A protein has these predicted regions:
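Extreme N-terminal starter segment of soluble prokaryotic enzymes
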Residues: 1-3
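Conserved N-proximal alpha/beta basic substrate-recognition cap immediately N-terminal to
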Residues: 7-22, 30-143
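Short, well-ordered alpha-helical microsegments
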Residues: 12-14, 150-154, 216-218
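Phosphate-binding site of ATP-dependent enzymes
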Residues: 20, 158-262
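Loop-centered beta-sheet repeat module
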Residues: 123, 129-183
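A short linear hydrophobic-aromatic micro-motif
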Residues: 143, 207-208, 281
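A short, acidic, amphipathic alpha-helical segment used as a generic capping/interface helix at domain edges
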Residues: 265-274
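Conserved metal-phosphate-binding beta-hairpin within the catalytic cores
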Residues: 274-281
Length: 281
């Protein structure tokens, strides 16, 4: 039995679940925002063993913890739905208790083979750790600087003709006034342009900059265990603000993708990278 821990809005698990089902593989989907409304659950132990049950009261499917042989932990959301509304304080407490249970249940499953990990995914998101491990396995990485001081960023930038600025954590900004979302893409700029930026622009936040590396094309490599699936992205035929600098901007401008035969030495380094990050995906 594969336990898929996700959310209602994520459509990507659906075709995967359908394919697994046609192959006779049992799957249980847990949409975490509806933990308290769409599911009944119980975890308990006695002197002999520990186990839990999950039952979807909407479709009648159920699973026991001892039946779970693999976990796909994909973008779970905090529990938000409640069977009944109470006061704001009580509702907040009930949601937090459900979130605590959900987190602890996912920790409890940490030793089961998984795609996605509550233990290591967050750690592996660290740009500093990614850079360090990538260098350790022999991958080339751009020179990088994080700082809240203009002097540090300027000193770093002056070593190069051009640098790129990247978001650290949040690549989107939601404007509540006009209810519009803005995407923060990687931006290329001349190093000299930093001279005119006021000091307070740096002290207000953390700047994440790297030297700009010209490229012939880009690769997006998906690792599943020891298997590498490489996609060549032909971003350099696009304009600067339409995918050349950040390929994600190219979706609406004819961005081309094609299968790429990844050299084995690069695949081996990617495998080692995942191993050191304690990830399977």
């Amino acid at each position: 039995m594969i336990l898929v821990i996700t959310n209602k809005e994520d459509s990507h698990p659906t075709p995967v679940i359908q394919l697994l089902t046609t192959r006779g593989i049992s799957v249980f989907r847990l949409n975490t925002e509806a933990l308290l409304t769409d599911y009944e659950f119980c975890w308990q132990n006695d002197a002999h063993h520990c186990d839990f049950t999950l039952a979807n009261i909407q479709n009648g499917l159920s699973v026991r913890g001892t039946e779970v042989t693999a976990v796909w932990d994909r973008r779970p959301e905090p529990p938000t739905e409640l069977p009944l509304q109470s006061t704001e304080v009580v509702d907040k407490h009930n949601r937090e208790e459900a979130l605590g249970f959900l987190r602890f249940l996912r920790y409890y499953l940490k030793d089961i083979p998984s795609i996605g990990s509550i233990v290591y995914d967050r750690v592996a998101a660290s740009k500093m750790l990614q850079t360090t491990i990538a260098q350790q396995v022999g991958l080339s990485v751009p020179d990088t600087c994080f700082s809240n001081r203009k002097a540090d960023i300027l000193r770093f930038a002056m070593q190069y003709k051009e640098i790129v600025l990247k978001p650290i954590e949040n690549s989107n900004i939601w404007n509540e006034d006009n209810e519009e979302e803005y995407a923060l893409y990687t931006q290329k700029t001349s190093s000299a342009s930093f001279h005119d930026v006021p000091e307070e622009a740096f002290t207000q936040t953390v700047s994440y900059v790297q030297n700009y590396v010209p490229k012939a094309y880009e690769l997006r490599i998906t690792m599943v265990g020891r298997r590498a699936f490489a996609c060549k992205i032909d971003s350099q035929c696009l304009d600067e603000d339409k995918g050349k600098t950040d390929w994600r901007q190219g979706y609406d401008y004819g961005l081309k993708h094609e299968i790429y035969n990844l050299p084995q030495d690069i695949a081996d380094k990617c495998i080692r990278f995942l191993q050191l990050m304690h990830l399977n995906f």
